[in-house]
From Swiss-Prot:
The keyword Ribosomal protein does not apply. Its cofactor is Zn(2+). The keyword Zinc applies. Belongs to the metallo-dependent hydrolases superfamily. Adenosine and AMP deaminases family. Adenosine deaminase subfamily. It catalyses: adenosine + H2O + H(+) = inosine + NH4(+); 2'-deoxyadenosine + H2O + H(+) = 2'-deoxyinosine + NH4(+). One of its GO terms (cellular component) is cytosol. Zn(2+) binds at residues 15, 17, 199, 279. Binds 1 zinc ion per subunit. This is Adenosine deaminase. GO terms for biological process: adenosine catabolic process; hypoxanthine salvage; inosine biosynthetic process; nucleotide metabolic process; purine ribonucleoside monophosphate biosynthetic process. GO terms for molecular function: 2'-deoxyadenosine deaminase activity; adenosine deaminase activity; zinc ion binding. Catalyzes the hydrolytic deamination of adenosine and 2-deoxyadenosine. Its EC number is 3.5.4.4.
Amino acid sequence: METKDLKKLAKAELHCHLDGSLSLDTIRQLAALAQVDVPQDDSELKQLVTAPETCGSLMDYLKTFDFIRPLLQTPQALTLAAYDVVKQAALENVIYIEIRFAPELSMDQGLTATQVVEAVLKGLEQGQKEFGIVAKAIVCGMRQSSLDISREIFANVLEWANKGLVGFDFAGNELDFPPAVLADLIKETQAYGLPFTLHAGECGCPNYIVDAIDLGIKRLGHVTAIHNQKDLLAKFIANDVTAELCFTSNLQTKAARTVEDFPYMQLRQAGAKLSINTDNRTVSDTNLTKEYELFVKHFETSVSDFLEHNRDAIKASFTSPAEKEALLARLDKAYQSYIKK
């Protein structure tokens, strides 16, 4: 399929980080609001906010976020940022998106976690009204931070549960802060009633995927380390887990050292549930259309495959059953003319 046709396909995205997905125009607006100087030249600015095609590691990739952090410290900035990412998604026919962010990273200048979430939800709502997309929020704890900080944030933001906030996650340094370290807090938070997704297996540790599944988590981000792990793949499928795959990002961070090391084909051939995601639109210089192009190029993914993956994404999404039903109907209708071809 040509790029224009891939762009027209209806899409769902489950794994998109707010601070890693801001457009250059919005970064300029945010910098002006924060009174931070940025390069006038777009290519120079892009270099500051985009990770190299090949990073030494995940931690090298994550350094790129340091530039954005000071720009997301006010309600106005957070609302603008959330609206921007929803707009970008809608313009490439994403009908459903879950945008994740860590309130802790926007609390440097006095905002509370509740205020951060409120501001982000306001931006999501503006984008939904303007573009006809459904956009929800996932709150992340940072793995490398004190568990008490994350515990307090998770408890405080519960007032937004099912008012746009639909789930929780842990992001950051997976290698040194595995699921075992987070397990008690994850169990506590699950008891509140909102589901968890979790970055797992991005650092080359299959046992972290095992631990996440054993915590009852039904969606896992990346799962790159499941490659060539036959027993783990069987466990993944038996537990009805959905993978949030991030191809470009995984190649950058060396989670997958080569295309052949990326687990998509093994997951697909085994019948595992999966979704295709950007991870970070700006940091990885990508969007869903570009990701779809890469899947066609490297894996010969078909329109029928994309429909199936998007159906998996919506079914595994954290929105309400009624909204899932409406989104699935919208998705199926959007693909009818392409499938007939």
